[in-house]
Design a protein with these regions (language model features):
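Structured, solvent-exposed acidic/aromatic patches
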Residues: 1-17, 25-253
């Protein structure tokens, strides 16, 4: 391919990242669990890394993870050798690639290597914890400008009209499919959360009691309903605006 080597590295590095991410996702969904103790001959998924269409047998889990690691290692090498800078957190850079590598190592039971890779992300990515991530009522978990986000989608509002987007299903604030069925946490799981954990304030165990404060934010629609343990996690600044909002795929706290 023509072009500057830095540009080629940037494009090719992202391509290898996406293939690693795709196989990593698929083998966890459709293949056997990776066993850290070895003998990963259980069925994984079909490996197809060439331009072909003929039927192929499923590869073993070990073979799939070998392919995954080859791709993500090459992605890290190429993205580390480019001078190109991403313009949006929906794009891939070296730190996101290292974050995925940390996830892969963790899944393979390689704890120390995973921790070392994650530490590189924490130390070098420039991402920082944001004090109001769990307390703000403006764009909570829906805005990639949050300094904790390493990677996330950034759709245009017109790309997801009406209710065909993640927040249309998950946000209790947007006029959406869950107007009558608010998204909530399992009460026994809620009880396991420490009272000193700031995230516990995202849920409302007595939401159906109008006299219990604070009250959860609900969409301004005729069908709005309340349910105990409902959530105010995916909050948007303008719930009346139709269309998709940003969705986090990788965040700094995951690496800590």
């Amino acid at each position: 391919a023509e072009g500057l080597e830095s540009e080629r590295n940037y494009i090719k590095g992202q391509a290898h990242f996406y293939r690693a991410f795709a196989y990593f996702t698929m083998v966890q969904m459709y293949g056997g669990r990776y066993k850290a103790e070895g003998d990963n001959t259980q069925l994984g998924v079909v490996i197809r890394n060439d331009n072909s269409t003929e039927p192929r047998a499923r590869a073993s889990v070990e073979e799939v993870y070998t392919q995954i690691n080859e791709d993500i290692d090459l992605a890290i090498q190429l993205l580390g050798a480019t001078e190109e800078k991403r313009t949006n957190k929906s794009h891939i850079d070296l730190h996101v690639a290292r974050g995925l590598k940390a996830r892969i190592l963790l899944t393979q039971g390689k704890w120390l290597e995973a921790a070392e890779m994650a530490k590189l992300v924490v130390d070098l990515s420039g991402a920082k914890l944001q004090d109001d991530t769990y307390t703000t009522l403006n764009d909570r978990f829906s805005d990639q400008s949050n300094t904790e986000w390493l990677w996330g989608s950034n759709p245009l509002l017109q790309q997801a009209p009406n209710l065909t987007h993640f927040h249309g299903y998950m946000s209790n604030e947007i006029i959406s499919y869950n107007g009558n069925t608010p998204r909530a946490i399992y009460n026994k799981l809620y009880d396991k959360i420490s009272d000193t954990d700031v995230r516990k304030g995202i849920w409302f165990p007595r939401a159906t009691d109008p006299n219990t404060l604070p009250r959860p934010i609900r969409a301004e629609c005729n069908s709005k309903a309340y349910a105990n343990y409902m959530a105010n996690k995916f909050i948007v600044s303008d719930p009346t605006t139709k269309g998709g909002r940003d969705v986090p795929f990788m965040r700094l706290p995951e690496m800590m």
